[in-house]
Amino acid sequence: MAPRPAMSHSSAFLLPSPSAAAAGADADGAAYALLVLNQRLPRFAPRLWDRAQVRVCADGGANRVFDGMPELFPGQDPDEVRRRYKPDVIKGDLDSVRPEVKEYYSNMGTQIVDESHDQDTTDLHKCVAFITENSAIPNKSNLCIFALGALGGRFDHEMGNINVLHLFPNNRIILLSDDCLIFLLPRTHTHNIHIERSIEGPHCGLIPIGAPSATTTTTGLQWNLDNTSMSFGGLISTSNIVREESTVVTITSDSDLIWTISLRHHS
């Protein structure tokens, strides 16, 4: 069997980097899109907004931007902050966005897309599909999508959002909250996760949500896995820790896994 290709991951997008933010891409050529769902904005929302080339609010996520962005800039004029952080698109069922918020952004040129006819997919699913199929990002081969507000709140919403990671396994999608981030590790690759200690860790986890794993091997963790099987009803790797001396965590598995790591609140 041919060796699997390696995939590298990094949370460096959470580090301050004005030059990269202005370009909408990192030095490695990664392009970013931002999705905002209907949960409280994390403290680093403006940083990711500035990095993104496309900003999409999923329905009630527009309320969160309208209300929450000025709260992240105390002392600044709220209307000026709202003008600065105007979403490109509001998309979804449009049953949660407040009428006055929808009108405000529509008058500023935001595209409003009513998807209320589609009751079979979540707002996150609709927005990811829009970004990957229809957005103005010219080269989507190295696209990374940040989803804010996908964690926290109702558990069924969280599970629906995690399911979207499995529905789009060939796209890099990162779900973020103030406390942690998660993303999918496709079984088609081995994975090298570069640890940014100033902003993340040490607590982490590897979870076989989609299907059991017969064999998973890791390096760089306090409790490494060595051809270990994982499944619900058996062992899953939660409350693990990135070793203090580790700069990279490596993971190889026969199953898709969810990686999660804590975020430091001073970042």
UniProtKB/Swiss-Prot annotation:
Subcellular location: Cytoplasm, Cytosol
UniProt keyword list: ATP-binding, Cytoplasm, Kinase, Nucleotide-binding, Transferase
Lineage of producing organism: Eukaryota, Viridiplantae, Streptophyta, Embryophyta, Tracheophyta
Species this chain originates from: Oryza sativa subsp. japonica (Rice)
Pfam families: TPK_B1_binding, TPK_catalytic
Protein function: Catalyzes the phosphorylation of thiamine to thiamine pyrophosphate (TPP). TPP is an active cofactor for enzymes involved in glycolysis and energy production. Plant leaves require high levels of TPP for photosynthesis and carbohydrate metabolism.
PANTHER family: THIAMIN PYROPHOSPHOKINASE, THIAMIN PYROPHOSPHOKINASE 1
Gene Ontology CC: cytosol
EC number: 2.7.6.2
InterPro entries named among the record's database cross-references: Thi_PPkinase, Thiamin_pyrophosphokinase_euk, Thiamin_PyroPKinase_B1-bd, TPK_B1-bd_sf, TPK_catalytic, TPK_catalytic_sf
Gene Ontology MF terms: ATP binding; kinase activity; thiamine binding; thiamine diphosphokinase activity
Gene3D superfamilies given in the database record: Thiamin pyrophosphokinase, catalytic domain, Thiamin pyrophosphokinase, thiamin-binding domain
Pathway: Cofactor biosynthesis; thiamine diphosphate biosynthesis; thiamine diphosphate from thiamine: step 1/1
Single Gene Ontology BP annotation: thiamine metabolic process
Domain of life: Eukaryota
Family membership noted in the UniProt record: Belongs to the thiamine pyrophosphokinase family.
Protein name: Thiamine pyrophosphokinase 3
Reaction equations catalysed: thiamine + ATP = thiamine diphosphate + AMP + H(+)
